A protein has these predicted regions:
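N-terminal cap/lid segment of alpha/beta-hydrolase-fold proteins
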Residues: 26-73
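Bacterial N-terminal signal peptides that target proteins for export
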Residues: 1-10
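Alpha/beta-hydrolase-fold serine-hydrolase catalytic core, especially in secreted/extracellular enzymes
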Residues: 244-302
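Gly/Ser-rich "nucleophile elbow"/oxyanion-hole loop immediately N-terminal to the catalytic nucleophile
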Residues: 68-74, 117-156, 163-164
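Short beta-strand element of the alpha/beta-hydrolase
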Residues: 72-83
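The feature captures the conserved acid-bearing segment of alpha/beta-hydrolase catalytic domains
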Residues: 167-255
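Bacterial N-terminal signal peptides
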Residues: 10-20
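Short amphipathic alpha-helix adjacent to the substrate-entry channel of hydrolases
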Residues: 89-107
Length: 302
């Protein structure tokens, strides 16, 4: 009977820990104020648009503040890379969320962004539009503050966009950056050389976001994300989320179930692109909030 009682106690403890983690992640901001501050919609109304090529094909989707005059600051640029077979609408909740905080987001419609070329080109397009008098973006963008952000294959593309364009990209954020074993092994992925990425070569600060989910255990495990984090010589953060939207977080959850990611993912960009001192406390100082959050076990900063 003692063995049975011990097993029951262990099971109950595990369940309570899981419930605590899930509750803490949505705990009304009393325990994790930075996460709470940026998890809800931002203060600015948003709108959307598209960029088309000469043939009329939509090449980028845009998510941006509806009234730049209301911001009181120049809008930093975020350029997004989809996961394999993905499209911007998959991550629209997250991308629109960023726009509500005053970021101008450009997202390639390509399902194959692993080379980083489309990601960098999107940032270059917006930087050029800032100087075009007839553009809605004219004079409103901070072209010196640009983040490359992506999911899975697009995460690799974000790293490549940054390492290949250090004068353009100033910060990076990745979601489930795959183990390099997978480079070139799946349909629509670039050939090995074209899609190879090396976070250790970054000169920009980076936030690696991973999960404890079963898909990521194969594609982008916590050990993989930790190894990427340790390889960098720049200011970096590693966030390993357990639950999002009261479900176990996994590989594409930033697109399919992003609620739990929004706070720290937005805070990193607020910190790195706008110098937000409140957002910075999640990642810096003697007690970074990210490291104390029970819904993000195994996280690290340096």
């Amino acid at each position: 009977m003692k063995g049975k009682h011990l097993r029951l106690a262990v099971a109950l403890t595990a369940a309570l820990l899981s419930a605590t983690a899930c509750t803490a992640a949505y705990g009304h901001g009393t325990q994790y104020p930075v996460q709470a501050a940026y998890a809800g919609p931002g203060p600015y109304a948003t709108t959307t648009g598209t960029v088309t090529d000469a043939a009329g094909t939509v090449t980028y989707d845009l998510f941006y503040p509806a009234d730049y005059a209301a911001l009181g600051f120049k809008s930093p640029i975020v350029t997004w890379g989809n996961g394999t077979w993905g499209k911007p609408s998959d991550a629209a909740v997250f991308l629109r969320h960023l726009a509500s905080y005053g970021f101008t987001v450009i997202a390639s419609t390509s399902p194959c962004t692993g080379t980083g070329k489309e990601i960098a080109a999107g940032a270059s397009y917006l930087a050029a539009q800032d100087g075009v008098p007839a553009s809605v973006f004219h004079g409103h963008l901070d072209v010196t503050r640009v983040a490359a952000v992506g999911l899975s294959q697009g995460a690799g593309g974000a790293v490549r966009a940054a390492t290949n364009n250090p004068a353009l990209i100033t910060a990076v954020e990745t979601f489930s950056l795959p183990n390099t074993f997978w480079i070139g092994r799946l349909p629509l992925c670039p050939a090995t050389a074209a899609g190879a990425y090396n976070p250790a070569a970054l000169t920009q600060p980076i936030f690696f976001v991973g999960t404890h989910g079963p898909f990521d255990a194969v594609a982008a495990s916590t050990a993989t994300e930790r190894a990427f984090f340790r390889s960098t010589t720049v200011h970096a953060a590693l966030g390993l989320i357990l639950f999002s939207g009261h479900k176990l977080a996994d590989h594409a959850s930033i697109a399919t179930n992003p609620a739990g990611f929004l706070g720290y993912a937005t805070a990193w960009l607020e910190y790195r692109l706008r110098g937000d001192a409140t957002a910075a406390t999640a990642f810096t100082g003697p007690h970074p909030e990210l490291l104390s959050n029970v819904n993000w076990p195994g996280s690290a900063v340096k």
